[in-house]
Amino acid sequence: MKKIEAIIRKSRFEDVKKALLAADIEWFSYYNVRGEGKMRQARIYRGVMYDTSSIERVLLNIVVRDKNVEPTIAAIQGAAQTGEVGDGRIFVIPVLDTVRIRTGERGDIALYLSLIHI
C-alpha cells in the first residue's frame, strides 16, 4: 500500500476530483492549505505593496493498493497539469498497515468499501 499526497491548485480541484472518481478511487480526503514557495511576488493594490508569498492550494490524501499507484498519479497529473509554474507536487509514501476501526480488518481489504459488512 502507498499513501499519495498531492498538492494542487485550488482551481484544478474539481477536475482532479472527477479524474479520481473516474479512475475508481473510492475515497480520499482533502484540505485547503497555504504554503510558501518560489512563486513569491509583491503586488501593489491602491498604492500599497503586499507580499503574496503565501500560496493557497489543496492537499489530497489517498491510500491505494500498490497496483493503483500509477493510475492514481496519472489521474491527478492529467487533471491538475496546466504547464505553468506552481502546478504542484505528488508524493508517494509507503504505508505499513491499515486497520478498519469498525471491523478490525487489516491490510488491503481495510481500504475499500465492502458490501459484506454493510
Language-model-detected regions and their locations in the chain:
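Mid-chain, well-packed structural core segment of small domains
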Residues: 51-85
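N-terminal first-folded block
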Residues: 3-42
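C-terminal structural segments of small proteins and small subunits
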Residues: 77-106
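A generic structural signal for short beta-strands and their flanking turns/coil linkers
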Residues: 2-4, 24-29, 56-60, 86-89
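Short, low-order "capping/linker" segments at domain edges
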Residues: 42-47, 97-114
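Short acidic, glycine/proline-enriched helix-loop-strand junctions
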Residues: 37-58
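Conserved small/polar residues in nucleotide/adenosyl-binding loops
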Residues: 116-118
